[in-house]
């Protein structure tokens, strides 16, 4: 498992600081604790924006009313803060991997979601050989000394730049894809 420090610093509310600390590109974001904070969204971001619950769930907002509606829904369900994140136009990619806690990457499997459920979960995907994604993963593990399994959620923009959207401190539901390409990450943990 990751250390408590690793777990906390990768929280959505800390993602900008995480990106700055480790030299990883992340979308610009803003933490919102109450309705009065929402007036800043239109000043700091171009629409659309992503409105994220602190633990789970997200919506895309194309105007201030949709930001407000998403904020109310997410804060009622998950509490505050709610995170407003720059919307990155592009294609979603993911990496699952395993760090040894000393900076070494034991395993890493990049993938592209091909079929997505109504909840945004991968129903089908393909592994991809992308050296930049693998290097980004090695950098993440090396700089943070990550311990345990993880999933990196990435967005590749139109300029082919990768942005880190989220770090899940667990193996993803699609972990069997890694087994299928010869990296049995669950077995490596035990």
Residue ranges and their predicted role:
Residues 1-3:
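Short beta-strand elements of ligand-binding domains
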Residues 6-90, 100-104, 131-134:
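Active-site nucleotide/adenylate-binding loops and adjacent lid/helix of ATP-dependent enzymes
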Residues 41, 59, 93, 160, ...:
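Active-site-proximal flexible loops/turns
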Residues 56-57, 115-118, 170-173:
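A short, flexible beta-alpha/helix-coil linker loop
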Residues 63-145, 155-163:
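Phosphate-binding site of ATP-dependent enzymes
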Residues 128-153, 158, 169-190:
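Active-site "cap" helix and flanking loop/linker of ATP-utilizing ligase/carboxylase catalytic domains
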Residues 165-167:
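Activation loop entry of protein kinases
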């Amino acid at each position: 498992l990751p250390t408590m420090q690793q777990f906390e610093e990768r929280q959505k509310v800390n993602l900008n600081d995480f990106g700055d600390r480790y030299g990883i590109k992340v979308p610009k974001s803003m933490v919102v604790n109450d309705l009065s904070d929402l007036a800043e969204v239109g000043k700091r971001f171009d629409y659309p924006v992503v409105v994220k619950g602190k633990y789970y769930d997200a919506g895309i907002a194309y105007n201030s009313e949709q930001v407000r509606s998403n904020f109310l829904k997410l804060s009622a369900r998950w509490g505050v803060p709610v995170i407003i994140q720059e919307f990155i136009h592009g294609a979603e990619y993911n990496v699952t991997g395993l760090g040894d806690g000393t900076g070494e990457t034991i395993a890493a499997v990049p993938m592209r979601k091909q079929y997505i459920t109504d909840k945004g979960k991968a129903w089908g995907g393909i592994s991809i050989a992308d050296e930049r994604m693998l290097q980004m993963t090695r950098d993440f593990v090396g700089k943070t000394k990550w311990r345990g399994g993880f999933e990196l959620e990435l967005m590749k923009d139109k300029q082919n730049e990768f942005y880190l959207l989220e770090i899940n401190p667990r193996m993803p539901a699609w972990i069997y894809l890694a087994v299928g390409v010869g990296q049995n990450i669950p077995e490596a943990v035990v």
